[in-house]
Amino acid sequence: MSCMKEQLIINILKDEHAPAQNKITVVGVGAVGMACAMSILMKDLADELALVDVIEDKLKGEMMDLQHGSLFLRTPKIVSGKDYSVTANSKLVIVTAGARQQEGESRLNLVQRNVNIFKFIIPNVVKYSPDATLLVVSNPVDVLTYVAWKISGFPKHRVIGSGCNLDSARFRYLMGEKLGVHAQSCHGWVVGEHGDSSVPVWSGVNVAGVSLQTLNPELGTDADKENWKEVHKQVVESAYEVIKLKGYTSWAIGLSVADLAETIMKNLRRVHPVSTKVKGLYGVHEDVFLSVPCVLGNQGITDVVKMTLKPEEEDRLRKSSDTLWGIQKELHF
């Protein structure tokens, strides 16, 4: 007597369980990791999504919760495991795991705690997905992207930090609020360190190609009567404010990471301000990672756009570089 499945379905081709072609792994199922996972699922970017964490109950619960929504998604396979074998053959590995930033704590204070976590994560990622692109989200992201690059042995174009993609998004949102224009039509770049010492490039701020600095030569300076400098100040303070109000940030960074994942997985060659090794650029002489406009595709970072920065902007970038290098050279890994 055949079973019901055999009565219902006639098998034509034996399923050989071919490996996923567009697999994405998210390491860490905290608030940020799950916001990344959900945003990626809503964009239909992967044919397999793998979740990894050290807390097995939460990990299984998050996986099951997503699986139960499969009817509403277009990602056929969602898996999880504490063992990194579940991540095998990933095209993109997104690292969100790490100690959470506390209220009032600077991103740089998190460093050594998260370095120790990376010493376990990165070798396991490399073991099972030696050809993957690494996208680091954990804070302080610029230092930890450097750490991931050093530990992984990957070429620099395949180790990317989410960097100022979110800072620039916040900047464009706040700019739009001030002008009454949607953020997508407001153009401006925040570069350098993700966070406290990020650098707004005021000369590039425009709407429909109209430079705001042409209309207001004092834009972003202390002499600016419209106080546009406050917009960047809000960008810097916004994460701290959200953490104070709800305990952590999640949705905006999740959407930002999915935006980067889309460009990489679809080989779109869009330009994003992401953290990459900037040695040799803008007078930087050390192995530091900072955000500059990068062309992204399925090989990672293929090109860097050479921005025309003012002397004071370059000086701020170099100061960020010096600060980060001062921290990096003291790290133990």
UniProtKB/Swiss-Prot annotation:
Q: Where does the protein end up?
A: Cytoplasm
Q: For substrate, which residues are the binding ones?
A: 107, 139, 170, 249
Asked whether the keyword Kinase is assigned, the reply is: no
- Its Enzyme Commission number(s) read 1.1.1.27
Which pathway is it part of?
Answer: Fermentation; pyruvate fermentation to lactate; (S)-lactate from pyruvate: step 1/1
PROSITE patterns xref list = L_LDH
Instruction: Indicate the secretion signal residues.
Output: none
Catalytic activity reported: (S)-lactate + NAD(+) = pyruvate + NADH + H(+)
- Return one GO MF term: L-lactate dehydrogenase activity
Alphabetical list of Pfam families matching this protein: Ldh_1_C, Ldh_1_N
The record's family statement is: Belongs to the LDH/MDH superfamily. LDH family.
Q: What does this protein do?
A: Interconverts simultaneously and stereospecifically pyruvate and lactate with concomitant interconversion of NADH and NAD(+).
Q: What is the name of the protein in this document? A: L-lactate dehydrogenase A chain
Organism equals: Ambystoma mexicanum (Axolotl)
